[in-house]
A protein has these predicted regions:
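A short, charged
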Residues: 78, 82, 86-93, 152-170, ...
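Divalent cation-coordinating acidic motifs and surrounding scaffolds
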Residues: 125
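Short histidine-centered catalytic/ligand-binding loop motif
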Residues: 67-75, 128-137
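Non-catalytic substrate-recognition/targeting regions of SAM-dependent transferases
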Residues: 108-121, 137-204, 212
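Rossmann-like S-adenosyl-L-methionine
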Residues: 178-348
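Non-catalytic accessory regions of SAM-dependent methyltransferases
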Residues: 1-122
Length: 348
């Protein structure tokens, strides 16, 4: 869709967040919009008085518009090249680009790079994109073109890991090349990453600094990594002197990847338990000085969190009942490293 884009007008006084450069426009702030707008259409946002506030992607949802620019622009290849160039320059500034010890990094992190609804992860010479909204998905071909330009054609595979519902008419997920996996380095450790079959874009890149932080506390400890996936935290623990590491995950595919990562890093004293985490915790007789608990999203929405809470209980009781057991499988002076996403709002 080229200029001119359909126009959406805000209610009086609702432009304050936009003037403060917040990219989300909620549906309740809209006063007037064309009747035939479809999910993913590009729109020009106007104030109540008709002042141009920005250009964004429209959706019939609570977040009605996600702004990609705070001016009137055309979302052509020049726009995308500039956005991706800015993102790459930032990664160069923090020494992630052409880093021999870390060959995987997040190039685009949604709102943080001014591209709400888009994730792009780089694995060596491969790029995996993930569109979280239909409007971004509709730009995937031009995003791939811009990636090729910004990286001077050095990206050999571009894979689209967006949700299945966005794809129509047997569209290919491969926008360039056909590689399904890669062996990458992160802070000197080697990992097998499979974006074709794996979770998210193949590896939880956003946990890189947490993995490095964890390595400061593992020396000579017995470590358990729950919901271990491909063993990212386990490798860091092993290579920083842990006495032993147990990884637990119900996925046999994750078990294969984790064991492969152990071999890639010449690590020892590791055992993978392919079973339900809570069953394992009830049955294990081991004692651990350091727990890593990075579970899947049990409840992404606040109402789901409320429904998961029984009267008088806490998340600690629900997710980690063995911590309150009379059998101390977490050492009394042990460390619990956990990462939970609960969304926003208050929980009664």
């Amino acid at each position: 869709m080229a200029l001119p884009y359909p126009e959406i007008r805000l209610k009086k006084g609702k432009e304050k967040s936009v003037l403060n450069f917040h990219p989300w426009i909620f549906s309740g702030a809209l006063e007037k919009m064309p009747a035939q707008l479809n999910n993913g259409d590009t729109v020009t946002l106007l104030s109540h008085d008709g002042e141009i506030l920005g250009t964004g992607l429209f959706h019939h949802s609570s977040i009605a518009v996600r702004l990609l620019a705070f001016s009137k622009v055309e979302l052509n290849v020049t726009f995308w090249i500039q956005k991706l160039s800015n993102a790459l320059q930032l990664r160069k500034n923090i020494h992630l680009f052409n880093n021999k010890e870390t060959t995987a990094y997040r190039l685009v992190h949604g709102e943080g790079d001014g591209l709400s609804g888009l994730i792009i992860d780089i694995y060596g010479d491969c790029a995996v994109i993930q569109c979280h909204i239909k409007g971004m998905f509709r730009h995937r071909d031009i995003i791939a073109e811009a990636l090729n330009n910004v990286f001077n054609q050095s990206i050999n595979t571009i894979y689209d890991k967006s949700e299945d519902s966005f794809f129509e008419n047997n569209e290919s997920r491969f926008l360039k090349g056909e590689k399904q996996s890669e062996i990458i380095k992160e802070n000197g450790h080697r990992f097998y990453v499979n974006w074709f079959e794996g979770q998210k874009t193949g590896f939880f890149i956003d946990q890189r600094e947490n993995r490095r932080l964890l390595s400061n506390y593992c020396d000579s400890k017995n470590v358990i990594n729950l919901f271990a996936y491909s063993g990212g935290f386990s490798i860091y623990a092993l290579k920083s002197g842990a006495a032993l590491v147990h990884s637990v995950d119900s996925s046999s595919r994750a078990e294969n990847w984790a064991n492969q990562n152990v071999q890639l890093n010449d690590a020892v004293n590791h055992q993978f338990f392919c079973e339900d985490v809570f069953t394992f915790l009830k049955e294990t007789k081991n004692n651990y000085q350091l727990w890593v608990v990075d579970p899947p999203a049990f409840a992404k929405r606040l109402d789901a969190v409320r429904n998961s809470l029984l009267p008088g209980t806490t998340l600690r009781l629900i997710f980690f009942p063995p911590l309150l057991s009379t059998r101390p499988i977490l050492h009394s002076s042990g460390i619990l490293a956990t990462s939970l996403r609960l969304g926003s709002g208050s929980i009664p």
